[in-house]
Swiss-Prot record:
Cofactor binding annotation: Binds 2 magnesium ions per subunit.
Residues holding Mg(2+): 10, 105
Active-site residues, Swiss-Prot/TrEMBL: 106
Protein name according to UniProt: DNA polymerase IV
Cited function: Poorly processive, error-prone DNA polymerase involved in untargeted mutagenesis. Copies undamaged DNA at stalled replication forks, which arise in vivo from mismatched or misaligned primer ends. These misaligned primers can be extended by PolIV. Exhibits no 3'-5' exonuclease (proofreading) activity. May be involved in translesional synthesis, in conjunction with the beta clamp from PolIII.
Similarity annotation: Belongs to the DNA polymerase type-Y family.
Keywords, alphabetical: Cytoplasm, DNA damage, DNA repair, DNA replication, DNA-binding, DNA-directed DNA polymerase, Magnesium, Metal-binding, Mutator protein, Nucleotidyltransferase, Transferase
EC number: 2.7.7.7
Length: 353
């Protein structure tokens, strides 16, 4: 089997970068893109000057201004971001047809069969970065590796404006030093559970056989076993289409009642809005839904056609879903089904209520 060559390209603070490009007076100052604080807006992204103050994506604009009083917050211009994204994807298509967009600002490319630069994935990534910089006047970071899991980690390794390469013969050593929190699909709760088992990095994870991991983590144990060895067989799908977009949170301490669940909704919905703003224009938001997993691992999902995507609608759905079990809750999720427009264009105003 031919060794795969995967590139993960991730634009550096994409929305903010476009704003600074189009208005140079914003460069070098703390900048965020998002909704206004007086309308309970949320930060979609921010530049590195703002991040130095602790400002982060999905944070409320009000809290961001408390951390950084000099922060400039501009409204999202989705048309401009989508146009820039199209230009970047046009560049990608010069090297391969196997492109899997993850959002407006990141994508996987499979260049295993590309003849450009003698088939060198590293040189292709270098050229993509050069062309994006020259044509769009923004920077992107890229990771090159034998699979998607490692390519995504690599693209983050030297951010911003960096390139990191993991060759096949470097995989075993590179992965052995990774903290388990870096593994695809490992969130805080799973990382904490691994830590309690004495597993903090992939070298320690490799000491566990597959069956033992399955006993502890169910089917995800098999995935952990593979990732600890740098194995990821997922293909780059250029025709993959999202069915939904959602946000879930597993709580360290079970939520004891409906009131405590409802209190968690606003934060989940703010994060959902941020994620929805990153999907491309070929989707239209459809039915909202909620997911509840109870302390005994039973779960229920409720979606409602015709319901709004406002806080009140989600509160009503969550109440109905909770009442199906009426038990302490370990996981809450909120989401939206997506309608595939296949290239349709619709402006989504997701940051202002």
């Amino acid at each position: 089997m031919t060794q795969r060559k995967i590139i993960h390209v991730d634009c550096d603070c994409f929305y903010a970068a476009i704003e600074m490009r189009d208005d140079p007076s914003l460069a070098g100052k703390p900048l965020a893109v998002g909704g206004s604080a007086d309308r309970r807006g949320v930060i979609a992204t921010c530049n590195y000057e703002a991040r130095a103050y602790g400002v982060r994506s999905a944070m409320s604009s009000g809290h961001a201004l408390k951390l950084c009083p000099d922060l400039t917050i501009v409204k999202p211009r989705m048309d401009a971001y989508r146009e820039a994204s199209k230009e970047i994807h046009t560049i990608f298509s010069d090297y391969t047809d196997l492109i899997e967009p993850l959002s407006l600002d990141e994508a996987y490319l499979d260049v295993s069969d590309s003849a450009h630069f003698g088939g060198s994935a590293t040189r292709i990534a270098q050229d993509i970065r050069r062309r994006v910089s020259n044509q769009l006047h923004i920077t992107v970071s890229a990771g090159v590796a034998p699979n998607k899991f490692l390519a995504k980690i690599a693209s983050d390794w030297r951010k911003p404006n960096g390139l990191f390469v993991i060759t096949p013969d470097q995989v075993e050593e590179f992965v052995s030093g990774l903290p388990v929190s870096k593994l695809h699909g490992v969130g805080k709760v799973t990382a904490d559970k691994l830590g309690k088992l004495g597993i903090n990095d992939c070298l320690q994870l490799r000491e566990w056989d597959k069956l033992a991991l399955v006993r502890e983590f169910g089917s995800f144990g098999e995935r952990l076993w593979s990732l600890a060895r740098g194995i990821d067989e997922r293909l780059v799908h250029n025709d993959s289409r999202r069915q939904s977009i959602s946000v879930e949170n597993t709580y360290d301490v079970d939520l004891p009642d409906l009131r405590s669940c409802l209190d968690k909704l606003p934060e989940l919905l703010e994060t959902l809005k941020t994620r929805m703003a990153r999907i491309d224009s070929s989707y239209r938001p459809g039915k909202p839904f909620v997911k509840v997993k109870f302390h005994d691992f039973t779960q229920t999902t409720l979606e409602q056609a015709g319901a709004g995507r406002d806080l009140g609608s989600y509160q009503l759905m969550l109440t109905q879903a909770f009442n199906r079990g009426g038990k302490p809750v370990r996981l809450l999720g909120v989401g939206v089904r997506l309608e595939d427009l296949r290239g349709g264009f619709e402006q989504m105003e997701l940051f202002e209520r």
